[in-house]
Amino acid sequence: MRTQVAIIGGGPSGLLLGQLLLKEGISNVVLERQTGEHVLGRSRAGIIETSTVELLDAAGVGERMRRESLVHDGIEIAFRGVRHRVNFRELIGRSVVVYGQTEITRDLVALASLAENYVGLPL
């Protein structure tokens, strides 16, 4: 196998990079030493920022995320018994999205296996 880029690590970042490179016509292979069961079974963060949502859309894997995620406009912080709302939408004009990184990984693995640039996972 000949490729232009080798990406070490088949988590969400490596898979996303691989997909974005493919969309630009740059051949690559994503190498992962763990099993698919391990990679897809580990618990990861569940909040992603708008810029990541935009990257996932650009990579072609945003459809399920758009359908199943929850938009979250802010958080509440308690200090000395008083709750304070931090409204992201009002402060910066953006929200965060509740969609687990494990789900992002599932979406990216499905796409990478179609492109056949993911090595190491028994998909």
Residue positions per predicted region:
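Beta1/beta-strand and adjacent pyrophosphate-binding region of the FAD-binding site
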Residues: 1-13
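Glycine-rich FAD pyrophosphate-binding loop
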Residues: 8, 20-44
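Cytochrome P450 catalytic-core helices
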Residues: 16
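Short, well-ordered alpha-helices that flank and scaffold nucleotide-derived cofactor binding pockets
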Residues: 19-23, 110, 114
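Short phosphate-binding/catalytic loops that engage adenosine nucleotides
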Residues: 26, 61, 117
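Structured helix-beta-strand junction loops
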Residues: 36, 71, 114-115
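Active-site-adjacent segment of FAD-dependent monooxygenases/related oxidoreductases
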Residues: 41-45, 49-111
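A conserved beta-strand/loop element that lines the FAD pocket in flavoprotein oxidoreductases
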Residues: 112-123
